[in-house]
Amino acid sequence: MTSPLAKGLEGTGNWVDDRIGGARYIRKSLNKVFPDHWSFMLGEICLYSFIILLLSGTYLTLFYDPSTREVIYNGSYVPLRGVSMSQAYESTLRISFDVRGGLIMRQIHHWAALLFMASIVVHLARVFFTGAFRKPRELNWLLGVGLLVLGLVEGFAGYSLPDDLLSGTGLRISYGIALSVPVVGTWAAFLIFGGEFPGANIIDRLYPIHILLVPGIILALITGHLALVWYQKHTQFAGPGRTEGNVVGSRIYPAYAAKAGGFFFLVFAVMAAMGGLAQINPIWLYGPYNPSQVSAGSQPDWYIGFLDGSTRLMPNWEIHALGHTLSFNVLFPTVLLPGILFTLLALYPFLEARFTGDRSFHNLLDRPRNVPFRTGLGAMAIAFYVILIIAGGNDIIASVFHVSINTITYTLRAGIFLIPPLVFWITKRVCLSLQHSDEELLHHGVESGTIRRLPSGEFVEETVALPVPYRILMTGVERDDQPALAGADGHTGPGYGEQYEVTGSSTKPRGFFREKRSNGSTAAPRPESTLPELEGSVD
């Protein structure tokens, strides 16, 4: 028997559907299929951490006062009572010690910000190494790079709002960076800070940027990113039943929705646990910002640390000409270098397509070992970044290990030029070696544990054909009619050798720039095609 409430909801739904006709679209959308591979959860962590940031940030906004007006602190934290400080710092202390749940909310917000940036970086790395940025998903790659840059801006703005000694030091550095820009730097610094540092308006201006402008743009980019994923369908790894024209996985309802909902609450629980148990950014220990004080061993959040490291490694180069000074030792590591790196990162899909001649649509992902040049580039970039992060803590390393800071700096200066190319070469050779291993398995099969005696009296181990899922993963195609290799001496197993040819594409493991390990041959690029209509399927 139908309840009155159910009848009322059904009637309301029918009334709405008669006017906007959304039932058919919703029914179709609920049947959409998403892949089940764990790596696709990395992007979801980014989304969930952003939701946590919005929720916790809204709570903090209710109690934070973005004012640089001087006040005398008389709150709960006894060591700072009677100290003159800005209203922004005083309100942050009040959130930490006097507002119920304020400190845990602050720490959840900070940990979620770190997780947000980490998930973006790891998600971009997954997309890069698997080739998920290739046609037709170049625009989504650009949106991801845009999210990364905006995340850096948003994190720095939020980190600067408490107006403590550590965040004030970061603002002082940013003021110097602005001054290093030729011609417009002085005017830009005065415009942003409202005069000579520390200025009177910087906190007032960072606040709307942090809570309104940048989050709004990030929300728009995330919405556009999800819309493109929904329209273009998900990429997937090669496997049984998976082709360029379908998606194998779980329907969005109920399986995927239940899994995604549980995963969100898991991320939220981890953030809550870290906010309650792991202290981060204890501003009461730093004290209010004072331009005459500098804290030793200060470190920014990890995603900004590479800029600190690049600045510390840069020699003290300045150019004096026509009565002006060009501070190249600040301009290059903090403005030019990140600009070049992020530009190359954004343009990479187009550069790869240009050099490889690949203009085809791709919905199946690459195995990193099968594109050794791209994988080597990614490993080289990671090595470059890690060296800069280490350089950002050269003073702490020198203090802990009792090593000369000059020795560390000069060593890292040499390493920044030598280590990344070495990592590239090693990674490329490892990828080619893994290709060789795959070809051996395809050719000879896998060991069976059975020993057979040949007519000549020799004992050999029998091999069996590689299981179909692994063969598909290595070759990218699914075929059951490939002949086993025959051998008169009995040494060849029932593998698939070099005979797996498919019309229209090369199924041999091949590298970037048409690279082939075994015989130096080149594989022709796939012919130009149109984007296939992707029909979802469930395994």
Spans of features found by a protein language model:
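Membrane-interface amphipathic/re-entrant loop segments adjacent to transmembrane helices
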Residues: 313-330
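Membrane-embedded alpha-helical bundles that constitute the cytochrome b-like, heme-associated redox core
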Residues: 1-313, 332-539
